[in-house]
Design a protein with these regions (language model features):
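N-terminal alpha-helical interaction blocks
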Residues: 1-108
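Post-DEXD/H (motif II) to motif III coupling segment of the RecA-like Helicase ATP-binding lobe
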Residues: 276-350, 358
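Conserved interdomain linker/interface between the two RecA-like ATPase lobes of SF2 helicase motors
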Residues: 62, 194, 327-389
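Conserved helicase/translocase motor-coupling segment
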Residues: 377-420
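Interdomain "pre-motor" coupling segment immediately N-terminal to P-loop NTPase/helicase cores
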Residues: 75-79, 92, 100-160
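Conserved helicase ATPase core of P-loop NTP-dependent helicases/translocases
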Residues: 233, 246-260, 403-420
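N-terminal pre-P-loop "Q-motif" helix
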Residues: 169-192
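Conserved strand-helix element at the start of the C-terminal RecA-like helicase core
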Residues: 197-205, 215, 220-235, 360-394
Length: 420
C-alpha cells in the first residue's frame, strides 16, 4: 500500500485519475505526464508501478496491517496531497468499503456549499476555468487546505470497538452537578442539543463524566473540543487519571496521538477537519477565543457530527447565538463548594502604577495579604510588554524571595511553565 520515493509525477497521475473528466481526456493526460517523466530523465520505480496499475486498472485488497494503519485517520477529510504525504498508493483504497470519496464543494440549486466548514456564502467561493472545466473552491476554510468541486477528498471510516474494561470515575458530585449530569445524559439520548450554563468553578468537566462513560460503553464516537491547546492537555491528563482503562486520542497543534478508541480530545481547529464522524461533540469554553465569533470553526463543528446527532456546549458566559441554537439549557448558578462567585472590586490608581513606574500602596497591600496567607496569586495584564515590568516591580516592592514567573502566548517555555 505504500511507496518509498515521492515525485511530482505521482501526484499528477492521481490528480488526473480522480478528477471529474472523461476517460479519453484522462488517457491523453496520462500520456503527457509519462512523456514529461521520460524527459525529466530520473527513474522512479514507484511512479512506473503506479502508472502501470492505473493504465491496466489493477485492483488491490488491503490487509489487516493496512487497515490498522489507516484507522488512525478515521473521520478526517484527506486530500490527495495528505495521502501522498503518508506515502500511500491511493488507488489501493478504491475497492475498500470503509473508504469514501467525496467532493469538498458541492452544488445545490445553483448554489455552492462547502462540506467542511458549512460555508454557503457565494461571495466566499472562488472559481476559475481549467480548459473547459469550471473549478470552484471555498475561501473561508482555505487555511486548512483547499477543498473544491474537482479533486475528491477521502474519508476513512474503519470500525473501532471501545474497550469494556473501563473503570467508571468515582468523582463525588454536588447535588446540582448530579442533577445536571443526569439531565445531560437524558437529553443526549433524546437527541437534544444542550447548553450547560455554569459559573466558573461549578465543575463543568465532572458534569460530562457520566455522558462520556455511557457513550464509550455504548461504542459511540465522542469528541471533547476546546479552543485552547493548554486546556486540551489539561483535560487529557484529568480524563486519563479519572477514567482508568480508557484510551484517548489527543490532537492539538503540537501533538497528534491516535489510539484504538472512539474518544477524542482536541482543539476546535482540529475538529473542523472531521466530517460527519462523531455521534456526540462536547465543546468546552464555547465563549473563548479563537472559537467564539469564528463562523468557520463554529459551523465546522456542526459538519463533524453525524446527521441528527448531538452537540453539547459548556460555558460560563454563553452568547445569545449559542442559547438560541440549543434545545435545552441546564443552569448551575453556584460553584461546587456552594459559595457564590467573588464580585470584582474596582480601585482607581494613578496611571503610572499601571506601567509599574510608581509604587502602589493599594496593590502592594492586597498582594501581601494574599501571600501572607500562603495562597497563590495570578495577575493578568493587558499586553505582553507589561509582564517583565510587573515581575520586576513585585521583586522590588514585595519580595525577592518568593517565586515569580510570567507566561504569554508566544513564550517558548509556555508548556513547561504551565504543566511542568
Amino acid at each position: 500500500m505504500f511507496f518509498e520515493d515521492h515525485c511530482e509525477f505521482i501526484e499528477a497521475l492521481y490528480c488526473v485519475y480522480y478528477c471529474d473528466i472523461d476517460d479519453d481526456k484522462k488517457l491523453e493526460c496520462y500520456k503527457n505526464i509519462y512523456d514529461d517523466y521520460v524527459k525529466f530523465g530520473k527513474i522512479n520505480k514507484d511512479f512506473e508501478e503506479i502508472y502501470n496499475d492505473i493504465i491496466t486498472g489493477a485492483v488491490y485488497t488491503l490487509d489487516d496491517s493496512n487497515l490498522e494503519f489507516l484507522k488512525k485517520y478515521n473521520g478526517l477529510l484527506l486530500s490527495i496531497s495528505d495521502l501522498l504525504r503518508l506515502k500511500i498508493k491511493i488507488h489501493y483504497l478504491d475497492s475498500n468499503p470503509y473508504i469514501n470519496k467525496l467532493f469538498g464543494v458541492i452544488s445545490h440549486k445553483k448554489n455552492y456549499c462547502c462540506i467542511r466548514c458549512g460555508n454557503n456564502n457565494q461571495n466566499l467561493f472562488y472559481s476559475y476555468k481549467n480548459e473547459d472545466v469550471k473549478i470552484v473552491y471555498c475561501m473561508r476554510c482555505l487555511e486548512f487546505g483547499r477543498v473544491d468541486n474537482f479533486a475528491p477528498m477521502f474519508q476513512i471510516n474503519i470500525p473501532v470497538i471501545n474497550k469494556k474494561n473501563i473503570i467508571k470515575p468515582s468523582t463525588k458530585l454536588s447535588d446540582l452537578q448530579s442533577e445536571a449530569s443526569k439531565q445531560l445524559v437524558i437529553n443526549t439520548r433524546n437527541n437534544k442539543n444542550t447548553l450547560v450554563w455554569a459559573v466558573c468553578g461549578a465543575g463543568k468537566t465532572e458534569i460530562v463524566y457520566e455522558l462520556v462513560y455511557a457513550s464509550v460503553m455504548s461504542n459511540k464516537r465522542i469528541c471533547m473540543a476546546i479552543p485552547r491547546k493548554d486546556v486540551v492537555k489539561e483535560l487529557y491528563t484529568r480524563f486519563s487519571k479519572d477514567f482508568r482503562g480508557l484510551d484517548i486520542n489527543i490532537l492539538h497543534g503540537d501533538e497528534k496521538s491516535f489510539v484504538d478508541s472512539n474518544f477524542y480530545i482536541m482543539t476546535t481547529h482540529q475538529l473542523i477537519k472531521y466530517y460527519k464522524y462523531f455521534d456526540i461533540v462536547i465543546i468546552d469554553e464555547v465563549d473563548a477565543f479563537p472559537y467564539s465569533g469564528d463562523e468557520c470553526l463554529e459551523e465546522g463543528a456542526l459538519s463533524s457530527l453525524v446527521e441528527e446527532d448531538v452537540l453539547v456546549f459548556l460555558s460560563a458566559t454563553p452568547s445569545k447565538k449559542i442559547k438560541s441554537y440549543v434545545d435545552d439549557i441546564i443552569k448551575i448558578p453556584i460553584r461546587y463548594h456552594g459559595y457564590l462567585l467573588p464580585v470584582p472590586r474596582i480601585r482607581k490608581v494613578n496611571k503610572k502604577v499601571l506601567i509599574f513606574e510608581e509604587k502602589s500602596e493599594i496593590m502592594n497591600k492586597y498582594i501581601s495579604e494574599i501571600l501572607n496567607k500562603k495562597r497563590r496569586l495570578l495577575v493578568f495584564v493587558p499586553v505582553i510588554a507589561m509582564c517583565q515590568s510587573l515581575k520586576n516591580y513585585l521583586e522590588k516592592y514585595i519580595s525577592e524571595s518568593i517565586k515569580i514567573d510570567y507566561v504569554y502566548s508566544e513564550d517558548k517555555d509556555r508548556s513547561e511553565k504551565i504543566f511542568g
